[in-house]
C-alpha cells in the first residue's frame, strides 16, 4: 500500500470520527440526552481512535502497529455498544437498577462500583432514548465501531508492505 493511499484512508476515517464526536455532543447539549456510563466509554473509544488516526497521519513507519491499536480500540468500543444493545433488549424487570450520575458515583462510591458501572452498564443504559430509522444510538455506534475494526484490520495487513 502506498503512503498516499494509507493517509487518504486514515483521513477519511478521521472525518467520519469527527462527525461522530460532533453528533454525540449535539445529542447531549442541543437535544438534552444524558450519556450513560456505557455511552461515556464508547465516547472515550472514539476519542482514542481519533488520536490514533492523528498519530498515523504523522508517520507511516509504524503504520501496522497503529492500525492494530485502532482495531483493538474499535473492538473495545464495539463491546460497549453491543453490551448496551443487550441491556436494551432485556425486559424491564430484568434490567439492572438505575444508579446515580457518574459525577455522584465518582465522588461518593468506591472505585470498584465506578468501574463496574463503566464496564457493565447500569439501568439507565437499558433505556432507549433516541432512535433514527428504527435503530437506537448504540446500534449506530456498533456499526461505526464495526467499520473501524474492519478498516483497522485491513490496514494492519496492508501496511506491512508500505513503499
UniProtKB/Swiss-Prot annotation:
TM helices/strands, residue ranges: 10-26, 45-58, 65-82, 140-158
Topological relation to the membrane, as annotated: Multi-pass membrane protein
Segments in the Periplasmic topological domain: 27-44, 83-139
A GO cellular component entry from the record: plasma membrane
Residues in the Cytoplasmic compartment per record: 1-9, 59-64, 159-163
Alphabetized InterPro entries for the sequence: DiS_bond_form_DsbB/BdbC (IPR003752), Disulphide_bond_form_DsbB (IPR022920), DsbB (IPR050183), DsbB-like_sf (IPR023380)
Gene3D superfamilies reported for this sequence: DsbB-like
Family: Belongs to the DsbB family.
Protein name from the UniProt record: Disulfide bond formation protein B
Species of origin: Legionella pneumophila (strain Paris)
